[in-house]
Structure formats: structure tokens, C-alpha cells
């Protein structure tokens, strides 16, 4: 499965939402996410695509990524209305999120094109706070030579837009940039995780591995 073959030259935005869910609630949570939530979000003007991932190793179990034309999509009347007019199903399942993590980010330092079935998410260590963009560009240039590399980019959270979810803890909440690598196989993702960690002087175990479940493009909606 592929979607969104390449980011345009303008800086895109991305909504990053990761969460755990109690096992007893997972069937209805997944049904809601697949049948209602993704489509609702992707229909918002300025949203380009939405995708669901599940953890292979590390991180919260579920991850949703929503790409937008720019960060401006998160300041529109339509986006605010999506929260003010929640369905009962949405209210129920948003309350089921456990240890959620919400970030609204600028997508920077893009290398490659296409969408991989595997995702590496590396929260950057504090030592990279000085020049994350340059290091992300250099890392992408090196990693694209690895077999199975699809694309890499840096997610830079916007402090004003990254408001926490109702059940998200604000204690020690750090808006850390995240380096993301997409790969075509699990083996490639493992190798790219090691390479990404080395590029940022990070522990490979601090990176999360996810697998794509499904994706929806705004262009596919009627």
C-alpha cells in the first residue's frame, strides 16, 4: 500500500497522536478509529492524509499521523469545530485513551519519497537541541543509501498548537523534536533505527518501531 508519494516543497504540518488503550476497550476503539475518526479528520480543509500505525517495539500501542498542507490547518474554524461537535462515539473513545501524546509539528528536512510500511520514530536527545535540522538533513543523506529506506523527516512540535489531550499528563511534558524514518521492511527498519540513533548520538532502544495499518488520502474522498 502506498499513499502520499512525496511531500511538496512547502512545509507541511503533521498531527502526531499516540496512545495506549485498555485491552477490553480495544475492539470498539479500533472500530471507531477505522470507521469514523480518520475520515472525519481527513475531511477537514487543509488535511491531506491520515494513517494508522501499530507498535512493533516501544512507544504507545497506537499511532495516528495526519498530514496537512501547513500548520495553518490547525488554526481554522473547521478544525476547532471538529472538537466542539464531537459525536458520542468520539467522546467515549477519546476518554478511553491511556497515556496519550499529542503533538502538532512542522515537517522539516525531508529526504526521499513514498510511504513505507514500517516507521521508526526517534525522539531526539537533549544533546541535539542546538542544530536538529542540520543533523536531520545529514542523517537522511546517509540513511538513504541503506536498502529499504523510503523517506525520512524531522517533526518539530509547535508549542502553541501542541495542546495536550484531556487525559495527557502535563507533568514534565517536553515538546521534543522527533526524527522519523520510513522503511519497506521490518529488517530495514531495524537497520535504519540503528543508523538514525548513531546519527543523533542516541540509544537505539529509545526509538519506537511502528507498522502501517492503513491510510486515507483526502483526494480519495468524494
Which residues make up each language-model segment?
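Macromolecular interaction modules
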Residues: 1-222
